[in-house]
Amino acid sequence: MGDPDNALPSALPLTGERTIPGLAEENYWFRRHEVVYQRLAHRCAGRDVLEAGCGEGYGADLIADVARRVIGLDYDEATVAHVRARYPRVDIRHGNLAELPLPDASVDVVVNFQVIEHLWDQAQFVSECFRVLRPGGVFLVSTPNRITFSPGRDTPLNPFHTRELNAAELTELLETAGFEVEDTLGVFHGAGLAELDARHGGSIIEAQVQRAVADAPWDEQLLADVAAVRTDDFDLTPAAERDIDDSLDLVAIAVRP
């Protein structure tokens, strides 16, 4: 069973383009990504799954606990080699997300977490996901909420992001490709992270960003708090229950008719 808590430190470098397990300094971002895999893994149970843009591979391996088959796809050759060596349950392939190297109607689920904001042609990619899904297949996608991730900006703060989305824009992108959006959810800080926000001047995120921008040593308390974050510290809440525009990350569950 995949367990990043017990994994050796990743052999892949931390570039800012992807998160990796096993690093105390990266743990907040890793857990914020991992929670969506954990909470939505049941949608992959017994199914043929493509993770389009699998990165380090920890998520594809987590999905492999329940799926019939997991295909991982990434454009970076070093990443593909890493996943092949580290996660043998994942059928890892090298390829471009703009032209998915799979036949039409060949998988039941496409997973795309924290990737679409890196792509230049998002509409082309979403159309490709529609193509490779079987009728009734599910597209699971997560992405930073533009409203809270890059507030008041026309361009993303993260230099690796090409275009960030708000909830309405994500829904429009999916529906234009032919998907029916079953649900939209938001990732929020739970009670424990709200306490850490208060401890670190109102935002544990901003505290980490300021340290990185200043290229300053880690404050001992900040590092300890970041290293202690767990997936249970995040809430994944339907848009019907909480204002989606206040969320940290957006999660959409879309179905190919």
Curated annotation (Swiss-Prot):
Disulfide bond sites: none
Enzyme class, UniProt record, top EC level: transferase
Entry's EC annotation: 2.1.1.-
Gene Ontology biological process: methylation
Consequences of knocking out this gene: Inactivation of this gene results in a dramatic reduction in the amounts of 6-O-methylglucosyl lipopolysaccharides (MGLP) synthesized and in the accumulation of precursors of these molecules. Cells lacking this gene do not grow at high temperature (42 degrees Celsius) in Sauton's medium, although their growth is comparable to that of wild-type at 30 and 37 degrees Celsius in this medium.
One Pfam assignment: Methyltransf_11
Keyword match Transmembrane: no
Keyword vocabulary terms for this entry: Methyltransferase, S-adenosyl-L-methionine, Transferase
An example molecular function term from Gene Ontology annotations: S-adenosylmethionine-dependent methyltransferase activity
Function: Probable S-adenosylmethionine-dependent methyltransferase required for the 6-O-methylation of the polysaccharide backbone of 6-O-methylglucosyl lipopolysaccharides (MGLP).
Family as reported in the entry's similarity comment: Belongs to the methyltransferase superfamily.
Name of the featured protein: Probable S-adenosylmethionine-dependent methyltransferase MSMEG_2350/MSMEI_2290
UniProt organism field: Mycolicibacterium smegmatis (strain ATCC 700084 / mc(2)155)
High-level lineage: Bacteria, Bacillati, Actinomycetota, Actinomycetes, Mycobacteriales
